[in-house]
């Protein structure tokens, strides 16, 4: 079983890093101004999506598993008007991904099935469920980011 746990943790941690690398590749050609531009009257900007994914990981993994004491302000993830520089937003995102990947790689088989508790995630009974749920969430928003980058950079 230890080999399976090591394979699972290695693969899952690498997946988070692939999401990070993909996002970096997609947002590389856009400016800070474009990061905060929403090309539609609905939805979110790339910047707000990155704040949201960062907050999600810092809360559900950082605060709930690592014990970072991160306090999430979810509404602000979608309404922040500070328009921080792209590099700062990406650095915060990278730190969250690094924290998650490091945490996952430290998990034993027993750790993966350790109880996980968050009132907003009742269908995540253990850490493995939380790690996979947050990976799916990050990938979902990666798709939205890819779409928005394509919209913001397409030729008229």
Regions found by a protein language model. Give the residues of each.
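Short, contiguous alpha-helical
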Residues: 2, 9, 13-17, 24, ...
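Generic structural signal for secondary-structure transition and capping sites
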Residues: 21, 32-35, 58, 98, ...
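Hydrophobic alpha-helical core bundles mediating ligand binding, dimerization, or RNAP-core interactions
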Residues: 12, 16, 20, 27, ...
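Acidic/histidine-rich alpha-helical segments that form the ligand environment
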Residues: 81-115, 129-137
């Amino acid at each position: 079983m230890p080999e399976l746990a090591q394979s699972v943790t290695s693969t899952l941690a690498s997946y988070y890093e692939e999401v990070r690398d993909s996002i970096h590749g997609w947002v590389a050609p856009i400016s800070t101004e474009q990061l905060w531009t929403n090309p539609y009257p609905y939805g979110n900007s790339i910047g707000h999506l990155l704040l949201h994914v960062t907050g999600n990981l810092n809360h559900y993994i950082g605060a709930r598993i690592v014990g970072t004491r991160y306090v999430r302000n979810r509404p602000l993830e979608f309404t922040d008007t500070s328009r921080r520089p792209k590099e700062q937003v990406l650095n915060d995102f990278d730190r969250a991904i690094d924290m998650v990947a490091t945490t996952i790689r430290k998990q034993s088989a027993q750790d993966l099935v350790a109880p996980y508790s968050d009132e907003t995630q009742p269908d995540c009974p253990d850490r493995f469920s939380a790690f996979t749920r947050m990976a799916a969430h990050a990938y979902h928003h990666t798709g939205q980011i890819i779409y928005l980058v394509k919209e913001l950079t397409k030729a008229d």
